[in-house]
Swiss-Prot record:
Residues that span the membrane, as ranges: none
Organism in which the protein naturally occurs: Rickettsia canadensis (strain McKiel)
Protein name: 3-deoxy-manno-octulosonate cytidylyltransferase
Gene Ontology cellular-component terms listed: cytosol
Localization annotation: Cytoplasm
Pathway given in the UniProt record: Nucleotide-sugar biosynthesis; CMP-3-deoxy-D-manno-octulosonate biosynthesis; CMP-3-deoxy-D-manno-octulosonate from 3-deoxy-D-manno-octulosonate and CTP: step 1/1; Bacterial outer membrane biogenesis; lipopolysaccharide biosynthesis
Record Gene3D superfamilies: Spore Coat Polysaccharide Biosynthesis Protein SpsA, Chain A
Annotated gene: kdsB
Length: 244
């Protein structure tokens, strides 16, 4: 397998404020978290883990041959949970890069994960995240995040508001991150910041501390399941692709 120095970690908590037991919701006959894991597994990476506080989630992943790392339910963010899981990976001294994939993207494309890894290894950036070019109509939902970048693709700011103001085309932020190990360790050591808490976007902690984030373009906006409405959208999407 390629990229033996990379760990892909999928954080998944059973409790969710907006959608009860979100990881266990069915899309077709398969749970959300199993779908995410199976999509990520298509990248064919040696070190792929689901990290969770739930025996039920663990049972689902182990049943399909996946590896699980248990982490405490009180960990505040997905990135914190990712780091705690990384510390528990056997022989983690051989892991130089960590990719954090949200556990609510049932149709995430494996090619996006591989693109992050390639860019992380071959660019000047220690943190990389994917973006998609979209029109205004596609990003107007409140949960969507846009990013402004410079001419080299370096992130300047992330916001839940549409940025830059007045534009006709935007960069939609896909909430997946690739970290060099040292960058993840540094991120975890920094306290939450004003802009992070204001926008409710933990990546702003990075920018506020003068750490660069590189962006790489990918082709499609993945469905993220946070609400019942999102779940129904995902179910409909699955039904449509199943007919093909």
């Amino acid at each position: 397998m390629k990229h033996s120095d990379v760990a892909v970690i999928i954080p998944s908590r059973l409790s969710s404020t907006r959608l009860k037991q979100k990881p266990l919701q069915l899309i077709g006959s398969i749970t959300l978290i199993e779908r995410v894991f199976k999509q990520v597994s298509q990248a064919n990476l040696e070190h792929t883990y689901v990290t969770t506080d739930s025996e039920e989630i663990a049972k689902i992943i182990k049943k399909v041959g996946g590896k699980v790392i248990f982490t405490n339910s009180n960990i505040p963010t997905g990135t914190d949970r990712t780091y705690e899981a990384f510390k528990l990976i056997p022989n983690n001294q051989n892991i130089n890069y960590i990719v954090n994939v949200q556990g609510d993207m049932p149709f995430i494309e494996p090619s996006s994960i591989l693109k992050i890894i390639e860019y992380l290894k071959n660019s000047e950036y220690d943190i990389v995240t994917p973006v998609v070019k979209v029109d205004k109509e596609s990003v107007e939902a409140a949960s969507n995040v846009t990013v402004a970048v410079n001419s080299a693709g370096k992130a300047l700011y992330f916001s839940r508001s549409l940025i830059p103001n007045g534009a006709e085309e935007f960069l939609y932020h896909v909430g997946i991150y690739g970290f060099c190990k040292s960058a993840l360790e540094k991120f975890i050591s920094i306290k939450p910041t004003f802009l992070e808490k204001t926008e409710r976007l933990e990546q702003l902690r990075i920018l506020e501390n003068n750490i660069a984030i590189g962006t790489c373009l990918v082709n499609n906006v993945p469905i993220s399941v946070d609400t019942e409405e999102d779940l129904q959208k995902a179910i409909k999407f699955y039904e449509n692709i199943s007919k093909l």
